[in-house]
Amino acid sequence: MGTEFNGLFDEWAHTYDSFVQGEDIQYKEVFAHYEDILEDVVNKSFGNVLEFGVGTGNLTNKLLLAGRTVYGIEPSREMRTIAKEKLPKEFSITEGDFLSFEVPNSIDTIVSTYAFHHLTDDEKDVAIAKYSQLLNKGGKIVFADTIFADQDAYDKTVEAAKQRGFHQLANDLQTEYYTRIPIMQSIFENNGFHVTFTRLNHFVWVMEATKQ
């Protein structure tokens, strides 16, 4: 993952929170049960947490309130600025992304929401292999993101978006790297993880992978 999405992130920073609240009809279903999704990720995490894609700090805040020690990584300067306004003054956010980041001393859980799709499947594999080296046995990866059960589910979702006139959503689904569950299952298992997938709305699944 290079810097190709940073301009998009900076542009989206000031409207992101209205998106997650369902104010954009095209993305309302993508962010359905948003608070529950964040809570599920928090509940599945433990100990020292490395968070990729802090964004505007919504998940970060819940992790801190739950007593987790959080190391935040975010590539977008605008996102970091907004998050810092919402989070405790002493909390620092480091510039970086899923593949290039400063490694904390000790990590128990790696988390992310609505972001892993910025990586190609090959990059996802590289990232998970890297995380496998960072985590001890029992360590976890908990990612919530739009993924699809199979190719048919993806095709039907894209077609439904087009039929409803949701052309921005359809374009998003076709240009970003939304993957399939069998692909992610293979990536996790090949890198020493046991993984489960839990669907929380039509688009978003929570991937909970435990290092074996």
Curated annotation (Swiss-Prot):
Enzyme class: transferase
GO molecular function: S-adenosylmethionine-dependent methyltransferase activity
Record keywords: Methyltransferase, S-adenosyl-L-methionine, Transferase
Residues involved in S-adenosyl-L-methionine binding: G53, E74, D97
Coiled coil regions, renumbered to chain: none
GO biological process, one term: methylation
Annotated Gene3D superfamilies: Vaccinia Virus protein VP39
Keyword ATP-binding listed: no
InterPro entries cross-referenced by the UniProt entry: Methyltransf_25 (IPR041698), SAM-dependent_MTases_sf (IPR029063), Uncharacterised_MeTfrase_YrrT (IPR023553)
EC number, as in UniProt: 2.1.1.-
CDD domains membership: AdoMet_MTases
Function: Could be a S-adenosyl-L-methionine-dependent methyltransferase.
Family recorded in the similarity comment: Belongs to the methyltransferase superfamily. YrrT family.
Protein name per Swiss-Prot or TrEMBL: Uncharacterized methyltransferase BcerKBAB4_4222
